[in-house]
Every structure is written in C-alpha cells, then in structure tokens.
C-alpha cells in the first residue's frame, strides 16, 4: 500500500524536483509544474506517453492543456498528500520532457 511521504522522504526526494522547477501547491499537499512544448502535437504526444505510465501505475495526474502548455499537479488522493507515486510520476515527466527539448 502507498503511504504519505515522511518528513525525511520529503527532504530527500522533493528537493531534486523543486530544483527542476516543481513547486509546492499552497493550501494542499501537492506539487505543480508547467511544461511548455513546441506545439500542440508535441504536448499531446508527451501527455500520451504519461497516460500510458499512469495507467500502469494506476496513478493519474491532474492536468490542464492549452495548445503547447501543460500544467500538471500531483498528489495521491488515497493518502491525502504526496507519496512515492507522485515522486515517481514527476521524475518520469522530467525525464520525458528533457528528451523532447
């Protein structure tokens, strides 16, 4: 079963994501990042790849897309905050975004 990140895990695992441009969401235990792509096709292709992992993980991001902009919020609803699944998903998004740029 997935558990909410401990304080130690938050310190160790969140910092690399914060350094990469993710930010903590005010008022809730979640992280957020906005990704910009060349065009809609590139954004949609990125989202499709993320969707495949999300299905395998049974962990789905909250996201909003307009043309080449994708806004992503991650939090684990079952635990009421950030979990290792959010760290894994955010790390995957970072890796995939770097491949496109």
From Swiss-Prot:
It is an enzyme of class 4 (lyase). Transmembrane segments: none annotated. The keyword Lyase applies. Keywords: Lyase. InterPro entries: PCD_sf, Pterin_deHydtase. GO terms for molecular function: 4-alpha-hydroxytetrahydrobiopterin dehydratase activity. HAMAP family: Pterin_4_alpha. It catalyses: (4aS,6R)-4a-hydroxy-L-erythro-5,6,7,8-tetrahydrobiopterin = (6R)-L-erythro-6,7-dihydrobiopterin + H2O. Belongs to the pterin-4-alpha-carbinolamine dehydratase family. One of its GO terms (biological process) is tetrahydrobiopterin biosynthetic process. This is Pterin-4-alpha-carbinolamine dehydratase. Pfam families: Pterin_4a. Its EC number is 4.2.1.96. The keyword Lyase applies. The gene is Pcd.
């Amino acid at each position: 079963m997935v558990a909410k990140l401990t304080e130690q895990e938050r310190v160790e695992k969140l910092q690399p994501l914060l350094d990469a441009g993710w930010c903590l969401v005010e008022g809730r235990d979640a992280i957020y990042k906005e990704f910009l792509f060349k065009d809609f096709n590139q954004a949609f292709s990125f989202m499709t790849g993320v969707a495949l992992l999300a299905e395998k993980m049974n962990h789905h991001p909250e996201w909003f897309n307009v043309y080449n902009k994708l806004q992503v919020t991650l939090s684990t609803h079952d635990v009421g905050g950030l979990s290792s699944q959010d760290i894994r998903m955010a790390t995957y998004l970072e890796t995939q975004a770097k491949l496109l740029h």
